[in-house]
Amino acid sequence: MSALLVLSTAPSKEVATLLAKTLVEQHLAACVSIQEGITSFFEWQGEMAQESEVLLLIKTKESLFEALKTTLCALHPYEVPEIIALEISKGHLPYLHWIDSVTKDPV
């Protein structure tokens, strides 16, 4: 099992909570941590932008990434949501096994 940490941002805690609950309820993520108080700076449509955002730290397995990404894109209010996956190369083995045990591959 190859575990991933997926990073995504949302415009509010309410949106982040909806995304997190959906991913966990659908067994696409073992855990989603929400961090408020993020400030993002980026260029959008030729203009410099600064926005307050909420960061989602999504723990899942690699085999679920495409389904997770599809679900995030379908529910996300952003035109181009941030969805970045980082492979977890090392970790506490019982935690990594837990990720595998509570997530379910699509049928």
Show the residue positions of the predicted features.
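Positively charged, small/polar-rich N-terminal and surface patches that mediate targeting and assembly
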Residues: 1-107
